[in-house]
Amino acid sequence: MAREREGRRRDEREERDTEFVDRLVHINRVAKVVKGGRRFGFAALVVVGDQKGRVGFGHGKAREVPEAIRKATEAAKRGLIRVALREGRTLHHDVAGRHGSGKVILRAAPQGTGIIAGGPMRAVFESVGMQDVVAKSLGSSNPYNLIRATFDALKREDSPRAVAARRGLKVSALQARRRDAEPGSADSADAA
């Protein structure tokens, strides 16, 4: 009975692991100075996502690279966040985030734009399942700061449902305002 339960848990864990895409962002060789000299190890930064709106990042350290990557992947799966995507492909609104001296600005983009972002930010967007986004990083280009700043920005992003609940409005009222505000829409052309 217990053996059967253990096998079932392992199957569920393996099934859960297959739904995630992991991207290795950065590997760093680190040294610890000891009495006999230096001990070398590795630090890995990994981003994990299901390409449906969930994403997380993790940092792992070990004496060997594969072990550091495994630890980082496990840490990333423990810290997943959910990101609300518009039409399953982009952000609902422009948003900025920062961590330390790293700053990022994320902008929603029209369909067909693609992911216009550099380095570590691209790994986050691919893992979360975004297809159209424009991102700019300012300040520090340290991958750890950029990843954390990107996650800060993604946490600040709200879905229309959350904004409507906060303002005490209906979602349809918000979306009507959005259509009125979009340049080139039929309603705004009639008003001009």
UniProtKB/Swiss-Prot annotation:
GO BP terms: translation
GO cellular component terms given for this protein: small ribosomal subunit
Alphabetized UniProt keyword annotations: Ribonucleoprotein, Ribosomal protein, RNA-binding, rRNA-binding
S5 DRBM domain location: 20-83
Chain spans, region Disordered: 165-192
GO molecular function: rRNA binding; structural constituent of ribosome
Family matches, as SUPFAM superfamilies: dsRNA-binding domain-like, Ribosomal protein S5 domain 2-like
Domain of life, per lineage: Bacteria
One Pfam family in the UniProt entry: Ribosomal_S5
Protein task: With S4 and S12 plays an important role in translational accuracy. Located at the back of the 30S subunit body where it stabilizes the conformation of the head with respect to the body.
Similarity-based family: Belongs to the universal ribosomal protein uS5 family.
Description of how the protein assembles with itself and partners: Part of the 30S ribosomal subunit. Contacts proteins S4 and S8.
UniProt note: domains: The N-terminal domain interacts with the head of the 30S subunit; the C-terminal domain interacts with the body and contacts protein S4. The interaction surface between S4 and S5 is involved in control of translational fidelity.
HAMAP family named in the record: Ribosomal_uS5_B (MF_01307_B)
Record protein name field: Small ribosomal subunit protein uS5
Lineage of the species this protein comes from: Bacteria, Pseudomonadati, Pseudomonadota, Alphaproteobacteria, Hyphomicrobiales
Gene for this chain: rpsE
